[in-house]
Amino acid sequence: MSAMVLPKEISQALVELTGEPREGMALVLLMRDYARHKLEEIDTALKQYEQTYGMSFEAFKQRWESQDREEDYAYARESDYLEWEALVTRRKRLETSFAWLP
């Protein structure tokens, strides 16, 4: 593991933001809070898609891949599919990347 030297201003900001005097632990706390915040944002967006379409992404994806519907070729629907899929992927990556955080 390599050591990281932070500028004094950043170190002070970390302490002020987290209340933790140890830089390393303060950075971990900040990362944890960031990950939680991003997950909350993603969950809000996911719920909006689920409410709009009345189903989970997995159900929507299965229907998308198995049925040929004219409305599925509309730009808005296709765009929603891609954005929804990106949110699901981003959520999984965040959960995996930050699973080690306390």
Identify the residue ranges that each predicted region occupies.
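Solvent-exposed, flexible loop/coil residues
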Residues: 59, 64, 79, 86
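Short, contiguous alpha-helical
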Residues: 82-89, 94-95
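Short, glycine/alanine-rich amphipathic alpha-helical segment
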Residues: 68-83
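Small, basic N-terminal interaction modules of short regulatory proteins
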Residues: 1-63, 92-102
